[in-house]
Design a protein with these regions (language model features):
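Solvent-exposed segments in extracellular or luminal domains encompassing
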Residues: 38-54, 120-138, 199-209, 281-284
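Extracellular interdomain linker/stem segments of modular secreted and single-pass surface proteins
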Residues: 74-81, 150-158, 165, 207, ...
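A short beta-strand segment in extracellular, disulfide-stabilized domains
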Residues: 2-16, 94-106, 168-176, 246-252
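Short, exposed coil/turn segments at beta-strand boundaries within extracellular/luminal domains
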Residues: 62-68, 138-144, 152, 193-195, ...
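Solvent-exposed loop segments of extracellular immunoglobulin-like
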Residues: 15-29, 104-113, 178-185, 190, ...
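Extracellular recognition modules
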Residues: 56-60, 132-136, 211-215, 298-302
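Short loop/turn motifs at secondary-structure boundaries
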Residues: 9, 158, 223-317
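Short beta-strand segments within Ig-like beta-sandwich modules, predominantly Fibronectin type-III
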Residues: 113-119, 189-198, 274-279
Length: 317
């Protein structure tokens, strides 16, 4: 802003070496003030006219005016740098770089020195940390800018916790870590999305197969995804060959998810009617080719992970 604090005693030291002994100096903003010895300035003085201002020194000897002389106060402008800033770097994009800039006016004649030792107006970096750049004018005036580069990153999926097998409420919790800030989305096998949300927990998730997407919103570093399943059991099926609900099979198991699970079907008296695995199409409602009647049937599901579920369903004809 062209304003600076001057110690007028520094001028006195230089001038008194050229004057006879016993001379004292006082400073004034105007010649008239110096002439009338009014409004003397303090020795620690802030100039009131930006960049260039003339004040007056009155030299006295035994209370007699020895002379009045001009003193020129000059404030040389500092380099024009933008404010300190914080930038983000996506660690997953290494070794790509981001640009750090002193953000000075075009066509300037500054000299630059970065904390990295580089001497250009901008530099490319791919390491987080604190960087400084000092710009110096041809007059030797310097100013320093600090740029902090902080990390962001895509998420690492540590675990997907699924509380399933419940008729009323299956709960999915996504455990992820990383330097970013994340939103969570799950998409079912039909491509329908629950929508992105801040919470990593999803309630009332229907049985089936899903993909979880985790998006970094701190610096848009990217999206990671992973498949998972929610186990569930149909309450009924209608094996009438109309292409809908013709087979009874456990939801959320397949050749990819818990393929070594064992599924057993019993009649109401506990007789084993059939046994199959997730890789089969399921039970078609027949035993040895004979259609079973409309009734309730019981199942035991022994999942590959060791969990066991028992319940019943209805065969409708």
């Amino acid at each position: 802003d062209g304003i600076n604090t001057f110690n007028l005693d520094d001028f006195s030291t230089d001038m008194l070496t050229l004057l006879p002994p016993g001379i004292t100096l006082n400073y004034y903003e105007t010649y008239d003030d110096a002439l009338t010895e009014t409004n003397a300035l303090p020795l620690i003085y802030n100039n009131t006219t930006p960049y260039n201002q003339t004040i007056y020194a009155r030299a006295e000897n035994n209370n007699a005016c020895y002379g009045i002389n001009q003193v020129f106060l000059t404030v040389k402008p500092l380099p024009q740098l933008s404010n300190d800033e914080t930038l983000l770097y996506c660690l997953n994009q290494f070794p790509e770089t981001i640009q750090l800039s002193a953000s000075t006016p075009l066509n300037n004649t500054y000299y630059y020195l970065w904390s990295t030792g580089q001497t250009t107006a901008s530099i490319a970096v791919n390491t987080v940390g604190t960087y400084t750049v000092t710009a110096t004018t041809v007059d030797g005036c310097s100013k320093t800018k600090t740029i902090i580069v902080e990390p962001s990153n895509i998420a690492t999926i540590d675990n997907i916790e699924v509380i399933d097998g419940n008729i009323n409420n299956n709960i999915v919790t996504i455990l992820a870590s990383g330097e970013g800030e994340y939103l969570y989305e799950i998409i079912n096998e039909e491509g329908l999305s629950f929508g992105y949300q801040e919470s990593n927990t999803f309630n009332n998730v229907k049985p089936g197969f899903y993909s979880v997407n985790i998006k970094d919103v701190k610096n848009n570093c990217g999206v990671v995804n992973q498949l998972f399943s929610v186990v569930g059991f149909p309450l009924f099926f209608t094996p009438n060959n109309d292409g809908s609900n013709d087979y009874w099979q456990v939801y959320g198991v397949s050749s990819q998810f818990q393929p070594k699970s064992v599924i057993q079907i019993f009649d109401r008296y506990g007789k084993l009617l059939t046994q199959f695995t997730p890789t089969s199409i399921g039970w078609d409602g027949t035993v040895n080719g004979i259609p079973m009647p409309t009734n309730d049937y019981w199942f035991t599901v022994k999942l590959q992970d060791g969990r066991i579920y028992k319940n019943h369903f209805t065969l409708k004809r």
